Amino acid sequence: MPTRLFTSESVTEGHPDKIADAISDAVLDAMLTEDSHSHAAVETVVTTGQVMVCGEVTTEAYVDIADIARSRILDIGYDSSSKGFDGASCGVSVAIDAQSPDIAQGVTAAYETRHGSTDLIDSQGAGDQGLMFGYACTETPSLMPLPIDMAHALSLQLTKVRKEGALDYLCPDGKTQVTIRYNEDDKPVAVDTVIVSSQHRAGIDLDATMTPDLRRLVIDPVLERYDLDHKDMRVLVNPTGKFVIGGPMGDAGLTGRKIIVDTYGGMARHGGGAFSGKDPSKVDRSGAYAMRWVAKNVVAAGLADRCECQVAYAIGAARPVGFRIDTFGTNHVPETVIERAVGEVFDLRPGAIIADLDLLRPIYSQLVAGGHFGRELPGVTWELTDRAEALAATARL
């Protein structure tokens, strides 16, 4: 029987790029806590002993960015130079400017308003041009692709084991990767390969200690959650042989460099825009969240088994310049019917998305590690299937 393989990866909160994401979103959340209408584009770079936070903001809030950065680093677990980073002693530099007034005028007085529209939702334009994708499928209960779902489960379990102290030699940096075998009907049938790489203290025996420990406490508990054959699975733990130097000492980290990890693990297309550090007026974030909401409701409504949605915006304009759906031949009604139903049930103007999903809240830090989609977390409204019934009814009129 012909089969194919598909692979997705995840990273832990201690990965350098995720440290940067965590700081950017912690600063954003702090601003939204004091001023829910803050506009922010916060970028972070971390390297050996150093953090730099830069970007543009418009806010009435006062936040101590250096203190937030240090606190977030310590929360992740970098509290000693022996781990490659220490939030208490690292240098933190801040270079934050005001948002460009040229951009701001397009967000607060959109193209439609300037051309006569009196609709309040038309007054908020997109914070940038761009295209965003959303995806859902029936491979998992969360309607996420199986490879990324399992990869995230492994990375979150690895962090849990470390933070609970079950394996006191583990350090914060880590990565996971899962390869799934699909049959000729494009259904997942087996786990082919699992890779777990974790930073650790020096002197730990990989074969005698670390591999069996991670198999017992990380890999096996995660595999038990999935009804999938794994008897012939290959397991690779720290395949370089050791992983002592990690975190920003091993690699510099930048905000927005794990966009595939943050979304669908490569199973769906990506418009290129990152999430962390951006308030929801940035459609890179709010548009992508809305597309997941739409795609998940299409699948939950039984209109398709797989659904990828694309939306596109012009900077300063409220109404999307493009929208399309691809169901990869799994649709149960014509795709044109699904697109029409989505247009009737969902309002994809930025102001409507922000209001409908209640995005002006400090909810973003919790999403930094483990993905922005498929999560059952407080305030993650884009995972609701609250419009599936309306979609189904509209599509079948």
Curated annotation (Swiss-Prot):
Superkingdom assignment: Bacteria
The protein, known as: S-adenosylmethionine synthase
Region named Flexible loop: 99-109
InterPro entries: ADOMET_SYNTHASE_CS (IPR022631), S-AdoMet_synt_C (IPR022630), S-AdoMet_synt_central (IPR022629), S-AdoMet_synt_N (IPR022628), S-AdoMet_synthetase (IPR002133), S-AdoMet_synthetase_sfam (IPR022636)
Family indicated by similarity: Belongs to the AdoMet synthase family.
PROSITE patterns listed in its UniProt record: ADOMET_SYNTHASE_1 (PS00376), ADOMET_SYNTHASE_2 (PS00377)
Binding site for ATP: H15, D173, G174, K175, K242, F243, D251, R257, K258, A274, K278
Main location: cytoplasm
Subunit structure: Homotetramer; dimer of dimers.
Record's catalysed reaction(s): L-methionine + ATP + H2O = S-adenosyl-L-methionine + phosphate + diphosphate
Known cofactor(s): Mg(2+); K(+)
